[in-house]
Design a protein with these regions (language model features):
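Short, glycine/charge-rich flexible loops or terminal/linker lids adjacent to PRPP-binding catalytic cores
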Residues: 317-362, 373, 400-407
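Secondary-structure transition/capping motifs at alpha-helix termini
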Residues: 138, 159, 292-296, 314-321, ...
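PRPP-dependent phosphoribosyltransferase catalytic core
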Residues: 172, 187-188, 223-229, 380-477
């Protein structure tokens, strides 16, 4: 019999990504715009947030704190962040742990000029670089892997009397992993993306200035017009005079993280030319072709699975119904001390609509199964509401491998599909049948030649270092 942990968050189905970044150059009240931009990226991180602004005199000021954007900032705090240039960050930690000291943007003082830094992703050789830098005398303010990049920049600036962009290029070429960085100095922002293109970063035009964001959904909110994506292996220098491009790596691949399309990004965002909602809807259509079910209605798990459920319903000819309702106001990190309290917590977050599902054979569409515990609870909710059959269809391949690029799955033990076959997983979640989308269909849904699908296939686009490599080689249980 499978036993669930006694202490477990009710929102344990949710994957958490490293964060989201947003920046503004050459626009009045840049901090206010950054506030709205971060609010649009809140789904990428709820643990903490921060903004650093640059005044007309070149002075940098920072406000950061734990909680949501609306909890950390108010009019008085934003008024203290005057200037036409700012960067911001929302955080959901996957490396370095929590605590205010790990909330970005980080702010660094240097005799060549202060600079601020915000990062989305994960640096897989951070521990090796940190040890190297500490042996060279670097003192770290946090346990975040992101701070490693800043110390590499400072080291290169100290050793070479040349423009900062060259120090950034040298530092970037020492990093391995997934990253979208914003580095802000007194008069410009450098937008940098890893050479594999694992994390998104886009540039927009607003009046005489520019904005840069992890997702394009933030552009419409602030009134900006999409210009282009930052390319893999590229540094885009953005100042009050315009934008300039430099390549720091000749090796480039467009290996966007598949989970950006499947789960993390907002449906109204476009990632490398493909709308997220359209991607998910097409994945649902292809899922029906690969795994049809003899059923009466299609129900999606809110919110990230709804687009795929629409596609499955259209392809199958079955009615799409709102058989599950999500309570958006439940706390984010409830941890319940007993089984009965956990069950109440799940019912607070998700409710089944018995008038819709009672007496029906349900196709339940979800974007992914990671740990499996919440899938089992949802199947149980539908059965208790009167569903006669529950056929689970997953709009992604089986999640079998840890991610080391900014998603909080670092061991095989926590992954259901690493421990169980599909029939075993089906029995565990209590479904009548279970099927997944194939990797080929996932690529087809996005009109892509390649994506990072390491969590599905085990084919990692970068080298894995130290303890991470050893963890990856562990025998699967």
């Amino acid at each position: 019999m499978h036993k669930e942990s006694i202490m477990q968050p009710i929102c344990d189905r949710e994957l958490h990504e490293e964060c989201g970044v947003f920046g503004v150059v050459g626009v009045p009240d840049a901090a206010n715009l950054t506030y709205y931009g971060l609010h649009s990226l809140q789904h990428r991180g709820q643990e903490g947030c921060g903004i650093v602004s640059v005044s007309k005199e070149g002075a940098m000021r920072r406000v950061r704190g734990e909680g949501l954007v609306t909890e950390v900032f108010n009019e008085a705090k934003l008024a203290n962040l005057a200037g036409d240039m700012a960067i911001g960050h929302v955080r959901c930690s996957t490396a370095g742990g929590g605590g205010t000291e790990n909330i970005q943007p980080f702010l660094f003082h240097h005799n060549t000029g202060d600079f601020a830094l915000a990062h989305n992703g994960n640096i897989v050789n951070a521990d090796l670089l940190r040890n190297y830098l500490e042996n060279k005398g670097s003192l770290f303010q946090s346990t975040s892997d992101s701070e490693v990049f800043a110390h590499l920049i400072k080291k290169e600036v100290r050793n070479h009397n040349r423009p900062r962009i060259y120090s950034i290029i040298e530092a970037l070429n020492m990093l391995e992993g997934a990253f979208a960085f914003l580095v802000m100095t007194a008069n410009r922002i450098y937008a940098c993306r890893d050479k594999h293109g694992l994390r998104p970063l886009s540039i927009g035009k607003l009046g005489d200035g520019y904005v840069v964001s992890s997702e394009t959904c933030a552009f419409e909110v602030v009134g900006a017009e999409f210009v282009r994506d930052v390319e893999p292996g590229e540094i885009v220098t953005i100042d009050r005079h315009g934008i300039r491009s430099s390549d720091y790596s000749m090796f480039k691949r467009h290996m966007m993280c598949a989970m950006e399309y499947i789960y993390f990004a907002r449906p109204d965002s476009d990632i490398e030319g493909r709308n997220v909602h359209a991607f998910r809807k097409e994945s649902g259509r292809l899922l029906y072709k690969e795994a049809p079910a003899d059923a009466d209605i299609v129900v999606g798990v809110p919110d990230s699975s709804l687009s795929a459920a629409m596609g499955y319903a259209e392809a199958s000819g079955l009615p799409y119904e709102m058989g599950l309702i999500k309570n958006k106001y439940i706390g984010r990190t409830f941890i319940q001390p007993s089984q009965s309290m956990r069950e109440k917590g799940v019912r607070m977050k998700l409710s089944s609509v018995s008038g819709i599902v009672s007496g029906q054979r349900v196709v339940l569409i979800d974007d992914s199964i990671v740990r499996g515990t919440t899938s089992r609870r949802i199947v149980r909710l539908l059965r208790e509401a009167g569903a006669t059959e529950v056929h689970v269809r997953i709009a992604s391949p089986p999640f079998k491998n840890p991610c080391f690029y900014g998603v909080d799955t670092s061991t095989y033990e926590e992954l259901l599909c690493a421990r169980m076959s599909v029939p075993e997983a089906c029995e565990y979640i209590g479904a009548d049948s279970l099927a997944y989308l194939s990797p080929d269909a996932l690529l087809k849904a996005g009109n892509r030649c390649e994506l990072c699908m390491a969590c599905f296939t085990g084919n990692y686009p970068t080298s894995l270092y130290g303890t991470i490599e050893e963890a990856n080689k562990k025998e699967k249980c």
